[in-house]
Amino acid sequence: MMLIKFIKMIPKIIHYCWLSSDPIPADLLSCMESWKKFLPDYEFMLWNFERFPKDKSKWVRDAFDNKKYAFAADYIRIYALYHYGGFYLDMDVEVVKPFD
């Protein structure tokens, strides 16, 4: 019961990162389709370098320049959750039932 109350306090936003100029692979797009299927009332926020420019944070720029892409994504993920709330999903997560 407490978990349900807690989830209701969290904004219905799903954050995810794609820090590449390459197209998103089909297997990841398939996982993301499951999000839309089971979470139709959620907003989906893609975090890329258009939404969060590398130069917005020296730490992100340094991490990316040193090919520490996961470190850059970690920073952006925490930024997104702190400023907007919601949930973060890696793009290879398949949702199999609604969160509520």
Predicted regions span which residues?
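GT-A fold catalytic core of metal-dependent nucleotide-sugar glycosyltransferases
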Residues: 70-100
